Amino acid sequence: MEQADSLSLPSATWETRYLEDVKLRRLVLELYDREHVALRRYLSFLGVEADTGREILQESFLKLHQHLLDGGDQSNLRAWLYRVAHNLARNWQSSARAAKTDFLADATATGDLPSRAASAEDQLLTVERAERFRAALRQLSAAQRECLTLRAQGMKYREIAEVLNLSVSTVGENVTRGLEKLKELI
């Protein structure tokens, strides 16, 4: 009898771990479905090329899964994910000493340009507006650009603070000053 009980315990433990892993995978997949497009856009904004961005995205979600398997905090997984992707992008940029990619090329890759059905004049106006906006963005500090980009992704100040490792008040200042400067420049 004792031997039978000891044999069933590892099986129960294995089943429990398996079921927990299945739940965590579902959670990661749900978060992927909700956030991967916006997160990829954010990486593109940071100057990460498309291929590298896909790798960083994949590594970020793998790290998220491992974080959850290790029993990590689940209170704000979206901010956690952005912080990891942000840090991976910064590490890539510093190790590769990569220059920022052309935003117009990224817009083409992500489909953010006007459709072919639009008139040539509309397309030209859209491209000119986008160029003016990008030129204005380049005049902001890196912190202001990052805060505004994450805010445009729908993040709250608290989440942005977590991602960028800043205080909430600093995030608020960066957003406010960034918007004011954009209004002046555009």
Predicted features, each with a name:
Residues 1-19:
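Extreme N-terminal regulatory/targeting segments of RNA polymerase sigma factors
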Residues 13-19, 27, 131-140:
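Short amphipathic alpha-helical boundary/capping segments
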Residues 15-41, 51-54, 65:
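A short, charge-rich alpha-helical start-of-domain segment used by transcription regulators
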Residues 26, 108-135:
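Acidic, proline/glycine-rich intrinsically disordered inter-domain spacer in sigma factors
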Residues 55-62, 66, 75-87:
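Structural recognition of an alpha-helix C-terminal capping motif at a helix-to-coil junction
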Residues 83-104, 113, 118, 126:
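Arg/Lys-rich amphipathic alpha helix in sigma70-family domain 2
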Residues 86, 90, 158, 162-186:
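DNA-recognition helix of helix-turn-helix
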Residues 147-148:
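A short pre-motif secondary-structure segment
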